[in-house]
From Swiss-Prot:
Pathway: Cofactor metabolism; retinol metabolism; Steroid metabolism; cholesterol metabolism; Lipid metabolism; arachidonate metabolism. It comes from Macaca fuscata fuscata (Japanese macaque). PROSITE patterns: CYTOCHROME_P450. CDD domains: CYP1A. The lineage of its organism: Eukaryota, Metazoa, Chordata, Craniata, Vertebrata. This is Cytochrome P450 1A2. Its cofactor is heme. Heme binds at residue 458. It catalyses: an organic molecule + reduced [NADPH--hemoprotein reductase] + O2 = an alcohol + oxidized [NADPH--hemoprotein reductase] + H2O + H(+); 17beta-estradiol + reduced [NADPH--hemoprotein reductase] + O2 = 2-hydroxy-17beta-estradiol + oxidized [NADPH--hemoprotein reductase] + H2O + H(+); 17beta-estradiol + reduced [NADPH--hemoprotein reductase] + O2 = 4-hydroxy-17beta-estradiol + oxidized [NADPH--hemoprotein reductase] + H2O + H(+); estrone + reduced [NADPH--hemoprotein reductase] + O2 = 2-hydroxyestrone + oxidized [NADPH--hemoprotein reductase] + H2O + H(+). Its EC number is 1.14.14.1, 4.2.1.152. The gene is CYP1A2. GO terms for molecular function: estrogen 16-alpha-hydroxylase activity; estrogen 2-hydroxylase activity; heme binding; hydroperoxy icosatetraenoate dehydratase activity; iron ion binding; steroid 17-alpha-monooxygenase activity.
């Protein structure tokens, strides 16, 4: 029987297909950088032609890449489409790259989705990493510290953050009581995110922030439209054809960024109308003081039109990260009531019921602090940092890494590494306490990865940790959280730039006592 009866293609078609395959193979092979003598490329698992490893990553890239690291080591390479991506796991390897070789790994890849964040001018997402970027980052850091964790001489509170959080936590307690008197239940994230946004809004804009306006509420309650497309491994960043196909998630992402930028731009412009450089009251005012009109900056001055970009980064990152942390904390507390009771016992013993918690109480509340650390570790709700890229040819752990290589930092793997934690799947706050149980095991706490490391480390890390602590301390002093019997709480993370839990609308809060 003739071979042609089994083959549905002509000889010409087979030759043409073979030629195309060889051409694609040659192009992909030729696109790989030459490795200097004596070095080697990172190990790379087998991937599909043209697709690379995108199918392997699936819906939970942090889990897939953690499994790969067990087989191939802390430095491995994958391909998304034809783009090589370096994946780093393991605390020591990540510290080597981001801290000891920080200048080599401080870049950002020029990804398509990043161009829609503050029109591609984001301090956090843009590829810039030179002297101008560094100066603006320092300016933003100083402004943030001055009007958050620095002391406030005009207030009885220890700092601006304590003043704003105390006010918003009290308002949140009142709002939750109203919901319990009405519907009798609530969604914790929807309530917490408004309070957190009001705090960062007050620090950014002072009295100019449109607190709880319809526009602001719409933005903060729909932040998932941002995080679902800004996550590491978004196919639209690696397969250009997807940009021209129907993509509802991408359209929501674009629309959200436009609305968010317009909202902040309007608020910044209104603030500037009565700005007084001799009476700076908030972060935006501090940025105005170090700005100049015109498109170019000189020295430590920045163009006024760029201020909204810095405010966008500060406001956007802080409200989403902190609200997500507090919401995850409440989810753990209702599933583990014994931990909630232990925290409240500590609060009653240290603070009592005659005053509200303050930031200065933090060292005396080690179990609450240990619970927060374990929430950060166990949820790992920031599974990857924003992707990095290499600024020059370099080596890491004996592997050659070319310039402009996209780099994924797997924070989830570090937080669930059995070599670090022993029983990473267990939720156990006690792991962060010293043997006496009275202080935090600081060396162990510093192994948690949530805010990145090195030159791209989150500038709001200290603010975020303080704010989560104070919100939880005030809420748990007065309220006991629960869900009705029979209601299942789903703690499965939903992948994104920040991983949310499934919404739970059946939360309840009981007032433990009232302040007179």
């Amino acid at each position: 029987m003739a071979l042609s009866q089994f083959v549905p293609f002509s000889a010409t078609e087979l030759l043409l297909a073979s030629a195309i395959f060889c051409l694609v193979f040659w192009v992909l092979r030729g696109s790989r950088p030459r490795v200097p003598k004596g070095l080697k490329s990172p190990p790379e698992p087998w991937g599909w032609p043209l697709l690379g490893h995108v199918l392997t990553l699936g819906k939970n890239p942090h889990l897939a890449l953690s499994r790969m690291s067990q087989l191939y080591g802390d430095v491995l390479q994958i391909r998304i489409g034809s783009t090589p991506v370096l994946v780093l796991s393991g605390l020591d390897t990540i510290r080597q790259a981001l801290v000891r070789q920080g200048d080599d790994f401080k870049g950002r890849p020029d990804l398509y989705s990043f161009t829609f964040i503050t029109d591609g001018q984001s301090m956090s997402f843009s590829p810039d990493s030179g002297p101008v970027w560094a100066a603006r980052r320092r300016l933003a850091q100083n402004a943030l510290n001055t009007f958050s964790i620095a002391s406030d001489p005009a207030s009885s509170s220890s700092c601006y953050l304590e003043e704003h959080v105390s006010k918003e936590a009290e308002a949140l307690i009142s709002r939750l009581q109203e919901l319990m008197a009405g519907p009798g239940h609530f969604d914790p994230y929807n309530q917490v995110v408004v309070s957190v946004a009001n705090v960062i809004g007050a620090m950014c804009f002072g009295q100019h922030f449109p607190e709880s306006s319809d526009e602001m509420l719409s933005l903060v309650k729909n932040s998932h439209e941002f995080v679902e497309s800004a996550s590491s491994g978004n196919p639209v960043d690696f397969f250009p054809i997807l940009r021209y196909l129907p993509n509802p998630a991408l359209q929501r992402f674009k629309a959200f960024n436009q609305r968010f930028r317009r909202f902040l731009q309007k608020t910044v412009q209104e603030h500037y109308q009565d700005f007084d450089k001799n009476s700076v009251q908030d972060i935006t005012g501090a940025l105005f003081k170090h700005s100049k009109k015109g498109p170019r900056a000189s020295g430590n001055l920045i163009p006024q039109e760029k201020i909204v970009n810095l405010v966008n980064d500060i406001f956007g990152a802080e409200f989403d990260t902190i609200a997500t942390a507090i919401s995850w904390s409440l989810m753990y507390l209702v599933t583990k009531p014994e931990i909630q009771r232990k925290i409240q016992k500590e609060l009653d013993a240290v603070i009592g019921r005659g005053r509200r918690p303050r930031l200065s109480d933090r060292p005396q509340l080690p179990y609450l602090e240990a619970f927060i650390l374990e929430t950060f570790r166990h949820s790992s709700f920031v599974p990857f940092t924003i992707p990095h890229s290499t600024t020059r040819d370099t080596t890491l752990n004996g592997f050659y890494i070319p310039r402009e290589c996209c780099v994924f930092i797997n924070q989830w793997q570090v937080n669930h590494d059995p070599q670090l934690w022993g029983d990473p799947s267990e939720f156990r706050p006690e792991r962060f306490l010293t043997a006496e149980g009275t202080t935090i095991n600081k060396p162990l706490s510093e192994k948690i990865m949530l805010f990145g490391l090195g030159k791209r480390r989150c500038i709001g890390e200290v603010l975020g940790k303080w704010e989560v602590f104070l919100f939880l301390a005030i809420l748990l002093q007065q309220l006991e959280f629960s869900v009705p019997p029979g209601v299942k709480v789903d703690l499965t993370p939903i992948y994104g730039l920040t991983m949310k839990h499934a919404r739970c609308e059946h939360f309840q809060a009981r007032l433990r006592f009232s302040f007179q």
